[in-house]
Amino acid sequence: MKGLELGSGSKEVSRAWRDLGIEMITIDHDPETEPDICCKWEDLDPADYQDIDIVWFSPDCTVYSVMSFPKGHFKEGVAVSDEAKASDASVEAGLDFIRAIDPGFWVMENPRALLRKRPFVQDLDRYTVSYCQYRAGITPMKPTDLFGVLPVSWEPQMCRNGAPCHIPAPRGSYTGTQGFQTAKERAVVPYELAASIARSCITEMHGGWQF
């Protein structure tokens, strides 16, 4: 089974998937993250990736995040800043690439905020999870949207505001997701979330073999 991580960053998804026996390729435009292939996904040729079974796509969330609401990147549903226009184009290019390689399963991840409002995701299946459900201890809740084609056997785990498993983070506070020191820390996908999805994918692709 072969997997592809677009916008791999910390490569936590690939670490989880490799531990389950999936052969991974990581792609990121930032050379500091040391991906297998350093480039923008806009520059990829779908013909080179026709054997991919599963894709994880993590586009930059900067203009879509709750913390960017006051910056006015969008007005009445229209991207008005150069940053928002570039982000929309980048996400659409990633989705076009995924459709072109047509993997059995794929997921695009972004915090629960403005990406879900963009017109180019309205026809996609969407699930919402809480990151605190996939990490040990008391951690930020970080509600996160997952778009794409996921296995029917996989069940998203969603928490509720005020639950004791995560750090309280009223809007405007500096706890919760806002309390992470860097954007890279905020972007790390929980290992167990990635692993739970991959286990379900493998189970369905192998006719019910349970992990």
Regions found by a protein language model. Name each.
Residues 2-47, 53-56, 63-64:
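SAM cofactor-binding core of SAM-dependent methyltransferases
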Residues 6, 38, 44-52, 61-211:
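Class I S-adenosyl-L-methionine
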